[in-house]
Amino acid sequence: MLRMRVDHVVYAAEQDGARATADRLAAMLGAEAFDGGVHPRFGTRNVIIPLADERYVEVVEVLDHPASDNAPFGQVVRARSEAGGGWLGWVIEVDDLSAQEERLGRQAVAGNRHRPDGVELRWKQLGLKGLQADPQ
């Protein structure tokens, strides 16, 4: 049986940037936001608001970097932020990504994030084209 769970939700930064946006949201949630790091392949950076059970809100903004113009995620974040920011999408973790690749007829793409402490996180993802066509 396929196991899946909500991993996090994504919120595009409002006009005053990811940090200020995340601080406002965190205050409403009774949480404390922290810098998440940079997505070099996407030309974005994020601020994390931790929630219960290892879930979180990711507040993301584009960087002034060519990757944000070329990567679908960077394009989606830029468009949503330029429209005032707000909820962008949600991320589901699955235990068998290959089954989802087969079901959708697409290969997952690599993603990574460099945290401020130097740790690099890596993952594979599907669905950015769908998010681009129909932002949440």
PLM region spans:
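Conserved active-site aspartate in kinases
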Residues: 61
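Short alpha-helical segments and helix-capping/turn motifs at coil-helix boundaries
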Residues: 33-34, 44-46
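Short, extreme N-terminal leader segments that mark the start of a protein/domain
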Residues: 2-36
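Vicinal oxygen chelate
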Residues: 2, 4-16, 37, 45-55, 57-58, 66-103, ...
